[in-house]
């Protein structure tokens, strides 16, 4: 992917890595995000450029969790990945476990920041093995140093109008 970032599908065997490579093992399932798409590479490049150790990151439309996990391995202090698709959230959680990333550093939730046109609010959901239920209406209770959204332009455009409350004063909004 990059000289020092390797995305390894669970079904492949790595043969050529360096000791300082960041290796992310992933099983995308039906969720978007294997790391090979050009837009994903653009977002990774911007994360490498702007992320500082200890930064907080909000991955909106996290898909398989690939950008969340890379941000964590690049030194983010905490990463929150959110997706509107319950299956994507489950895939992200499984991929984080596969890469030995604990919930103290990386968390995933199901939600929609554009729900009901509430600026700065969204709906999150609690997931269990058999049901999905609305848990709370999410107020902006945390700001992030970086918000990354590798999703369709049709979503990024309206999202850009509501993302400001989630960013710290000098935060970055990375989109592709």
Can you describe what each PLM-predicted range is?
Residues 30, 34-114:
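Conserved SAM/SAH cofactor-binding pocket of Class I
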Residues 20-28:
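A short, charged helix-loop
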Residues 1-17:
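N-terminal auxiliary segments of SAM/dcSAM-dependent transferases
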Residues 14, 33, 154:
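Active-site beta-alpha loop architecture of Rossmann-like, nucleotide-cofactor-dependent enzymes
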